[in-house]
Structure formats: C-alpha cells, structure tokens
C-alpha cells in the first residue's frame, strides 16, 4: 500500500479513485493532480513507480490542505462563529441546521433522534 498524506491508499484501484481516500481530495482535485503529473487515467496504484508516488506526495504537501490540517481549520472556523455569537454560531451551539432549513419537521440528522414528550396524551372526543 502506498502512503500519501498519512493515509494508506488501496493498491488495486486506479490512481484517480485511490487519491479520494485522502480527506480533502475529491474527484476534481484527484483528476487535476493526475493531469499535472501526467499520470494516465487507467493507471493503478500498484503500477506507480516510487518516483511518481514521491511526486504525488510532494504536490499534495505543497499545494493542498488535507487531513488533519483541513479538519483543524474547519473546526476552528466553527469555533470562531460560536465565539462571535453570530446567528450561525448560535445555530452550531444549539445543534440546529445552520443554513436556513426548516426545523418544525425534518432536521432529524442535526437535532438527533425524536423524543416523545411524556404526559402529553391524545384527547378523545
């Protein structure tokens, strides 16, 4: 297994697909990395030479923010919003949707599992 940015990427997959295992590298970024280094689309990780792996590693380290650095930056951005006390920060603090989605119904992913209210019973007529 090749180790890139602290992640063991699978050897039997194509390079464009395998690079996506690194947090912060998606389809377009993986494709642009392969284009810059002139790695063919059909080439698999186990077919890469040591020199090509080193070039990929150097390119990612120099130009991209991935893995721990990216996670830390995202967490710091959210913490900054919460410390400011702005609307988005308050929504993060309360664990509610941040981008204007409705919360009367839905938003279960952000709010957690629905809890029934004890003592509230249906009235029969």
From Swiss-Prot:
Q: Which GO terms describe its molecular function?
A: rRNA binding; structural constituent of ribosome; tRNA binding
Cite the Gene3D superfamilies for this sequence: 1.10.8.50, 30s ribosomal protein s13, domain 2
Q: Which UniProt keywords apply?
A: Ribonucleoprotein, Ribosomal protein, RNA-binding, rRNA-binding, tRNA-binding
Decide whether keyword Ribosomal protein is in the record: yes
A Pfam family in this protein? Answer: Ribosomal_S13
PROSITE patterns named in the record: RIBOSOMAL_S13_1 (PS00646), RIBOSOMAL_S13_2 (PS50159)
Q: GO cellular-component terms in the record?
A: cytosol; small ribosomal subunit
Q: Name one GO biological process term.
A: translation
Q: Enumerate the InterPro entries for this protein.
A: Rbsml_uS13_C, Ribosomal_uS13, Ribosomal_uS13-like_H2TH, Ribosomal_uS13_bac-type, Ribosomal_uS13_CS
Q: Would you identify the family this protein belongs to, as annotated?
A: Belongs to the universal ribosomal protein uS13 family.
Function (record text) = Located at the top of the head of the 30S subunit, it contacts several helices of the 16S rRNA. In the 70S ribosome it contacts the 23S rRNA (bridge B1a) and protein L5 of the 50S subunit (bridge B1b), connecting the 2 subunits; these bridges are implicated in subunit movement. Contacts the tRNAs in the A and P-sites.
Q: How does it assemble?
A: Part of the 30S ribosomal subunit. Forms a loose heterodimer with protein S19. Forms two bridges to the 50S subunit in the 70S ribosome.
NCBIfam families referenced in this protein's UniProt entry, alphabetically: uS13_bact
Q: Which protein, by its recorded name, is this?
A: Small ribosomal subunit protein uS13
Q: In which organism is this protein found?
A: Gluconobacter oxydans (strain 621H)
